[in-house]
From Swiss-Prot:
GO terms for cellular component: nucleus; spliceosomal complex; U4 snRNP; U4/U6 snRNP; U4/U6 x U5 tri-snRNP complex. GO terms for molecular function: U4 snRNA binding; U6 snRNA binding. It comes from Saccharomyces cerevisiae (strain ATCC 204508 / S288c) (Baker's yeast). The gene is PRP4. Component of the U4/U6-U5 tri-snRNP complex composed of the U4, U6 and U5 snRNAs and at least PRP3, PRP4, PRP6, PRP8, PRP18, PRP31, PRP38, SNU13, SNU23, SNU66, SNU114, SPP381, SMB1, SMD1, SMD2, SMD3, SMX2, SMX3, LSM2, LSM3, LSM4, LSM5, LSM6, LSM7, LSM8, BRR2 and DIB1. Keywords: mRNA processing, mRNA splicing, Nucleus, Repeat, Spliceosome, WD repeat. One of its GO terms (biological process) is snoRNA splicing. This is U4/U6 small nuclear ribonucleoprotein PRP4.
Length: 465
């Protein structure tokens, strides 16, 4: 008989506890699979389209009945835990999270325009020139009647009133964070979207629901925008890579889907109507922004240029320019009449999450993960940025200019749970609004600046007036 004992025959005391441990060996062993699963989950992209693509590569079903986005990620993680080879392959794949990008030449290239795009650009030339002419004429008339004393008094009164806005209402509207709020053209209703993928329309003064929750998207909703000339049509975008066009009817009490805009390959973070209402712009994590025909839902333009995902975009009031903000910490100005890049604005150290044009037509504000708001004057190409605001102690999630007064006020929100109000003359902070118990993701301001709405991680929409 051998005096040795085989390794597999060694007795294991599962109830043993170390001198500094409160857990037994059995308890620790039970936790190991969970810890491994969490480690794998951290390496898996959040975008549902990427998760489905990886499942397809592994020859697994992309979708299982009654499975939501998070359950699909967990299923992928469990598959990867079983097959270490597949895990290694995925770990070696580049650009899976948009963090690594192959180095390419920065040489500009052009593709032939379709007949639809040529027709759209001809319209945009005439439309933007006429809008610009009217805006400049209005500015000249205002200058001729300008009274310094009255102007200063009016601005001080308006800024003080804006800074003294108070919380007037709050409504819990979803089971997950509110990621988008948007006031209708007449400010009578507000549309909300959440990370649960649901849409809802509320009365903007009472916050009472006017529609049932509509499970419109799979995954997080990125943005909502109303048609500039209509109070019953809006668009939304989300993590599922889709833009959806809805018709809202107060009488029928619901939202009706008019169609989908399909083309982006990854999550869509922002969507905006062109000032004419004839076109739609979208920003996506597939490193492109795109221009669509609002009536036919046809893609007119696919614009590359950013090295990482595009998170936000905004149209200039004349309709000639668009500003895109990217995860590469750059914002870029594009002339959509010609398809050329006009300017690159570099001033953030972290990704840009929000972009907004002033109604004056020559200032654009960008907010980023560095907590800074940069305000650029595009008339001063050589001088670059006009001013830098140390706005929030964390991520700046949204910036908005006031509308009817020509952008005399700038409002922002961020992950420090605050809404800040700034004067566009001095860029000094005039006040802060505190009321959210968690991070704020989105806000919108009424046309006359008499009230604003906001939403965030506390799953509520709040009214300030």
């Amino acid at each position: 008989m051998s005096k040795y004992i085989a390794l597999e025959n060694l007795p294991v005391d599962l109830q043993h506890k170390g001198a500094t441990q409160n857990e037994s060996t059995a308890d620790i062993l039970k936790q190991l699979p969970h810890e491994r699963l969490q480690a794998v989950l951290e390496k898996i992209p959040e975008e549902d389209l990427e998760v489905r693509r990886l499942l397809s590569i592994l020859k697994k079903p992309e979708v299982v009945e009654n499975e939501d986005v998070q359950q699909r990620r967990i299923r992928l993680a469990e598959i990867l835990m079983v097959d270490e080879i597949d895990l290694e392959n995925i770990n070696n794949m580049e650009n899976i999270n948009g963090e690594e990008v192959d180095e390419e030449d920065d040489e500009d290239f052009f593709t032939p325009a379709t007949s639809e795009l040529i027709f759209a650009r001809r319209f945009l030339i005439n439309y933007s020139l006429e809008r610009s002419r009217k805006r400049l004429q209005k500015e000249m008339e205002r200058h001729q009647k300008f009274n310094t004393r009255q102007e200063l008094l009016s601005r001080r009164t308006e800024l003080q009133r804006m800074a003294n806005l108070e919380l007037a209402g709050s409504q819990l509207v979803s089971t997950k964070p509110i990621s988008a709020v948007s006031l209708s053209t007449d400010d009578m209703v507000v549309a909300t979207g959440s990370w649960a993928g649901d849409l809802q329309v509320l009365n903007s003064q009472t916050l009472q629901p006017l529609t049932q929750k509509l499970d419109s998207h799979v995954g997080k909703i990125g943005a909502i925008d109303w048609h500039p000339d209509s109070n019953n049509q809006m668009i939304s975008c989300a993590e599922d890579g889709l833009i959806k066009n809805f018709q809202y009817s107060n009488e029928e009490g619901g939202l009706r889907l008019l169609g989908d805009l399909v083309g982006h390959e990854r999550r869509i973070s922002d969507v905006k109507y062109h000032p004419s209402g004839k076109f739609i712009g979208s920003a996506s994590h597939d490193m492109t922004w795109r221009l669509w025909d609002a009536s036919t839902h046809q893609e007119l333009l696919l614009q590359e240029g950013h090295d990482k995902g595009v998170f936000s975009l905004s149209f200039q009031c004349d309709g000639s320019l668009v500003c895109s903000g990217g995860m590469d910490s750059l914002s870029m100005l594009w002339d959509i009449r010609s398809g050329s890049k006009v300017m690159t604005l570099a001033g953030h150290s972290k990704p840009i999450y929000t972009v907004a044009w002033s109604p004056n037509g020559y200032q654009v504000a960008t907010g980023g993960g560095d907590g800074i708001i940069n305000v650029w004057d595009i008339r001063k190409r050589d001088e670059g940025q006009l001013n830098q605001i140390l706005a929030h102690r964390n991520i700046v999630t949204q910036v908005r200019f006031s509308k009817e007064d020509g952008g005399k006020k700038l409002v922002s929100c961020g992950y420090d749970n605050l809404i800040n109000v700034y004067s566009s003359d001095t860029w000094l902070k005039m006040g802060s609004l505190a009321g959210h118990t968690d991070k704020i993701i989105s806000l919108d301001i009424s046309n006359n600046s008499h009230f604003l709405v906001s939403g965030g991680w506390d799953r509520s929409i709040k009214l300030w007036n």
